[in-house]
Amino acid sequence: MCCALGPGGEPSCKDDRVRHDDVFRLNEPRRVAVLAVHTSPLAQPGTGDAGGMNVYVLQTALHLARRGIEVEIFTRATASADPPVQRVAPGVLVRNVVAGPFEGLDKYDLPTQLCAFAAGVLRAEASHEPGYYDIVHSHYWLSGQVGWLARDRWAVPLVHTAHTLAAVKNAALAQGDSPEPPLRTVGEQQVVDEADRLIVNTDDEARQLISIHHADPARIDVVHPGVDLDVFRPGDRRAARAALGLPLDKDIVAFVGRIQPLKAPDIVLRAAAKLPGVRIVVAGGPSGTGLASPDGLARLADELGISARVTFLPPQSRPNLATLFQAANLVAVPSYSESFGLVALEAQACGTPVAAAAVGGLPVAVRDGVTGTLVAGHDVDHWADALAGLLRAPAPAAAAMSRAAAAHAATFSWDHTTDALLASYRRAIREYTTERRGVGA
């Protein structure tokens, strides 16, 4: 019998040997250690390195907790004010691990701090009774490196989600963008080789893992991300525009995301510049190589002579983002690389059609010709034609596309994501039990 503090600080006294054996006999996880080294799930999407992955980590944790599974998320502390532990919701903790200086570390510097981060993770686990976690789920390759160590130390399976791959990003670099370093490619290969199961967003991403990193197809699970249908839902366009102070009588194209070459916000401005009278709303903050020129997009708007037609907004809260999607005639997602594209899904959940690049997971998130338009390549004229086609659609066709967009997005709930995630966890535990512990048949 071992007594320790539970996730909420309450005493927890259990015969852990029995509990852990039950987990591996029943293939049911009770506690999950989630690793998100380079960005906190509590960070505002659209700032720094925060984006779809942050939303994914937080939403899956919340939904797992609602099913009685405790989740502890480990992320690197980025401010001295970050508390060591934050209770986000019943059953969900975020542990801010001190690993390196709080400020001034770029994501590409973080490999130098993985040892410090891993030490913090192991210390946290040591404060619990032995066998506290039943599974480790790492997000992004940096976390996978730490998850590899934790898996071996704790004797539990490692599930890994890459979110993006260096080789895929490097094959589709925007002009002026910097390639991912060889170090990352090596690190990703190691994690793919070591993980017990690999979770991908789409079948296309599964094929990439197999062709680039020679992943075993039998160890890959396709789990589509979801959308919060309570927040992102159709609304009154005029009311949404009034709330945001946007004109009621103009066509509006919205871009939402981090301001960096990878996301291609410049394509939206250049294409919209060819469409007289169209207003553009850009919501997001500079990130990655975009930090080198945080005002670059505003300067581009000035050079194109459309500054009066462009509204720049900082990263928005989820309710405000839903209002922006409701206000827009369409949302543009012209990324050069996108493993899925949650923004496209969230926009469609609000009944707003999407013009998206035909890359990565976007052909899954957007049904071409039904819920929006997929654009091959990044030719500005092609993008201008795509935007114009959606904006000039007859009212009945536009209304039908809006309904189809909302219906399509409704099939991607976080409950569905959690069902598939738990199925992957169960497979990981069952296989780990059989292959590594020699238990079962």
Swiss-Prot record:
EC numbers for this chain: 2.4.1.250
Pfam families: Glyco_trans_4_4, Glycos_transf_1
Parts forming coiled coils: none
Any one GO MF annotation of this record: D-inositol-3-phosphate glycosyltransferase activity
Source superkingdom: Bacteria
Residue positions binding Mg(2+): 325-326, 328, 352
Complex and partners: Homodimer.
Protein name per UniProt: D-inositol 3-phosphate glycosyltransferase
